[in-house]
């Protein structure tokens, strides 16, 4: 069972490490040192729910419903374009709000709402958890499938907390106008690239 658990850890890490809306949001909250551990926890718990749904049967629903898959794709493209546009606006703005009073006025509930949108409207989350993990998990027996799911959840929890803590630790170097412009420009380009790739895949 440990081999199955390790397989889940490695596969979960491989899918969660690339930059996406979730990672970008956790990183930015870590840099601001604003509810970053709460955000990491909520992202990890959301992933746990999605992983469980995908591995224990939810993948069949998404694979069999072309209408649902199309709705997820269209919503995901729109969200990624909007997320990328916001990052680009920040990258090219004359005055970037760092850890100022205006930034800190964001309420806890607004941050939670943004985190939920970043997670649950991210099409790659469903692709990873429902299609990839669901397909692989279905190959295991019930006991082994639980260990596989636990391994992927371990990777998720470890990564989000490590990212939040590392970003908070590096905040003095990352929370500068120049670095923030570079980070937001890179995030915006990646989000638009993912949106284009997803739109082309959905069109096909």
From Swiss-Prot:
GO terms for molecular function: L-arginine transmembrane transporter activity. It is found in: Cell inner membrane. PANTHER family: ARGININE EXPORTER PROTEIN ARGO, ARGININE EXPORTER PROTEIN ARGO-RELATED. This is Arginine exporter protein ArgO. Keywords: Amino-acid transport, Cell inner membrane, Cell membrane, Membrane, Transmembrane, Transmembrane helix, Transport. It holds the Pfam family LysE. It catalyses: L-arginine(in) = L-arginine(out). One of its GO terms (cellular component) is plasma membrane. Involved in the export of arginine. Important to control the intracellular level of arginine and the correct balance between arginine and lysine. The chain crosses the membrane at residues 1-21, 37-57, 67-87, 111-131, 154-174, 179-199. Belongs to the LysE/ArgO transporter (TC 2.A.75) family. It is a multi-pass membrane protein.
């Amino acid at each position: 069972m440990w081999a199955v658990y390790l397989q889940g850890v490695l596969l979960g890490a491989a899918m969660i490490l690339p930059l996406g809306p979730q990672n970008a949001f956790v990183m930015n909250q870590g840099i601001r040192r604003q509810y970053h551990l709460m955000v990491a926890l909520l992202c990890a718990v959301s992933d746990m729910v999605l992983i469980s749904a995908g591995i224990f049967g939810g993948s069949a629903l998404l694979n069999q419903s072309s209408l649902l898959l199309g709705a997820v794709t269209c919503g995901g493209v729109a969200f990624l374009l909007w997320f990328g546009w916001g990052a680009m606006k920040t990258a090219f703005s004359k005055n970037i709000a760092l850890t100022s009073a205006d930034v800190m006025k964001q309420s806890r509930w607004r941050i939670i709402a943004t985190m939920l949108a970043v997670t649950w409207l991210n099409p790659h989350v469903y692709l990873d958890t429902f299609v990839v993990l669901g397909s692989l998990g279905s190959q295991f027996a019930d006991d082994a499938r639980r260990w596989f799911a636990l391994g992927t959840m371990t990777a998720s929890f470890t990564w989000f907390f490590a990212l939040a803590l590392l970003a908070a630790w590096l905040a003095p170097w990352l929370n500068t106008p120049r670095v923030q412009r570079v980070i937001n420009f890179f995030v915006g380009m990646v989000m638009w690239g993912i949106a284009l790739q997803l739109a082309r895949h959905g069109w096909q």
